[in-house]
Amino acid sequence: MAEAQSRMRVLWWGTYDPENPRVKILQQGLQSNGVEIVRCHRAIWGAQTKTQMTRFLKVWKILRCFCSYPRLVFCFFTAPKSEAVVVSHLGLLDLFVLWPFSRVRGVTIVWDAFISLYDTVIFDRKMAPEGGVAARLLWGLEYLACRMADCIVLDTRAHADYFAQTFRLPPEKIKVIHVGAEPSVFPLTTAEHFNDTEEFIVLFYGTFIPLHGIDTILDAARLAEGLPWKWVIIGKGQKDGRLRAELAAHQRGNIEWIPWVDYSELSLWMDRANVCLGIFGDTGKAARVIPNKVFQILSKGKPLITRDSPAVRELLSENEGVVLIPPADAKALVEAVKKKQSLWKEFHLYHKVVREKILPEYLGKQFLNLLQIRKS
């Protein structure tokens, strides 16, 4: 009975996407460490927020968001008392609604910010000018949101330093928990699924946002024409226009583009690949984050080529299964594949040590320690 009474309870509150890998990994990790999770959730966002939405759909999503808050507030007050309430990304508006009510109940707010909307919209995707009204508004909203949260969680130390400097925060307010991967969705590759043909498969998947560096991958594929490599590119998004134009203008026999694959099927494509690609963008954000795909590649035990950065160095260094290259450098990407081609032609598993540090249980223990410190 005493053990049941001492079990920590956390309220997960807001309009987050429950299928987002970050959310699933943190929730699973906490539960595996004995934490009870109570969910107060209204579905607003989903896969379309990461690809393309029509203007009507964007307006509809915003309207749904505002209409959801009365129910979420009611849920907050009727939910059992928790040691902390967690707000996941995209949780900017959630914080503004939750903050006054959290003060009434005396509950600690932990914001898993994950990304800066200001950085993403203004500097990474360049959807509005620096110094413009939209930029100042987004900065102001995030500045205030950072002060509403009692603790902010980010995915890398480099990202945490950016938040501290940009939004003028004390460093001790920000904690770091890596993204991790779902081993049930991205299990280790087995020899029977591995590509054993004469074709050497270089795999990239993503939503073609600037930090992915799709232009670098296409330039590398062009430079590698005539070599026995197939570049399999899965996905679509903001920068797929270059890929469409490339395939329309030239007969690229070494590129296979698959616009969409179900999330659950990505692992099968990774099984067949000789090497998987991370990111190659040269934006500031690309240097501060380690994207989901890198953790998923590590979880599969597959060889990885990605851009070098302060963020990735927090987790990885070069070895037989990892090559780090300068950002936006197509020639370096081609040379990296050439250098490792003979090794990666054969079946090997890599990243044994680091895999243990990206499991949900490991990350959940870090999150639990953070919550216990806040509680004490």
Regions found by a protein language model. Give the residues of each.
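An aromatic- and histidine-rich active-site surface loop
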Residues: N20, V85-G106, V110-V121, I325
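Membrane-proximal helix-turn-helix segments that form the acceptor-binding/catalytic region
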Residues: V73-F74, P100-V104, G132-I152
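Carbohydrate-associated surface elements
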Residues: A158, G180
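Conserved donor-binding/catalytic core segment of Leloir-type glycosyltransferases
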Residues: F194-R222, V232
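Nucleotide-sugar-dependent
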Residues: H212, D262-W269, C276-L298, I305-E314
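A charged, aromatic-enriched C-terminal amphipathic alpha-helix characteristic of glycosyltransferases
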Residues: L268, A328, Q341-K375
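Conserved acidic donor-binding segment of nucleotide-sugar-dependent glycosyltransferases
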Residues: E318-D329, V337-W344
